[in-house]
Amino acid sequence: MKKEEMILVVDTETAMINPTAKVSGCNSLVYDIGLAVANRKGEIAEKRNLVVNDIMFGEYKRMETCYYAEKLPQYYVEMGTGVRQIVSLETARRIVLELMEKYNIKKVAAYNMMFDYYALKKTNEFLGGKFEFFPEDTKYIDILKMARGVFKNNKRYSNYCYENNLLTENGNPSISAENVYRYITNNPDFVESHTGLKDVEIETEIMAYLNNRKCKLNRKIAFNY
């Protein structure tokens, strides 16, 4: 019997290196990593909630100006109670490699995968690391690209966005993770947590929903950087 394929879903929260520059993975330092090992149905086998101490505490000036700085008190409380595991970036990488080996994972997924990939890469470089965060042969799945493929010209989704004012600055239907999750759960009042683990859980649900809509995790979606 063929063993079920497992995927590592990742979400990062970041502080900007240069607060006045454009938001991008290459201008970001990762302080929070959410990890979920899941199958194509979105069933989670294992999850981790990691805080990168080198950035959270070592770059406190930048942390004060991060996009979701108002959530920092929540982090401090949860770190104190053990809900969040405080680690170095190198230890976070070791945990990722152990999970990938344990579940024979070859694919890593994220909503806007390029941002998370380059944010982790830039954080590693910033801290003087010489390693690649993920194994060299890893395939990457961008859940955002999957969502665009399913919802871009979907009249029902567009109508839902217009009815609930879930629009971009240009007035087009938004395909953010928050708004896609609002649609698939029919909960227009849902507010994304913008913390690593909580966000990775909803992104796993979105991935499963899209996969059920025949948006296959094929070579057009899974790619190398």
Give the label of every model feature segment:
Residues 2-123:
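Conserved non-catalytic scaffold segment of RNase H-like nuclease domains
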Residues 12-16, 145, 202:
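Short, glycine/acidic-enriched loop or turn micro-motifs at the edges of active sites
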Residues 17-19, 148, 205:
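Conserved protein kinase catalytic core
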Residues 79-83, 129-134, 187-192:
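Short, polar/flexible loop-turn hinges at active-site or ligand-entry regions and domain interfaces
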Residues 107-114, 118-119, 159-225:
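Acidic, Mg2+-coordinating catalytic module of metal-dependent nucleases/exonucleases
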Residues 114-139:
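Substrate-recognition/cap helix-loop segment adjacent to the acidic, metal-dependent catalytic center
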Residues 134-141, 146, 192-200:
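Short, surface-exposed recognition loops or helix-turn segments adjacent to catalytic cores
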Residues 140-168:
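Short alpha-helix plus adjacent loop in nuclease-associated cores
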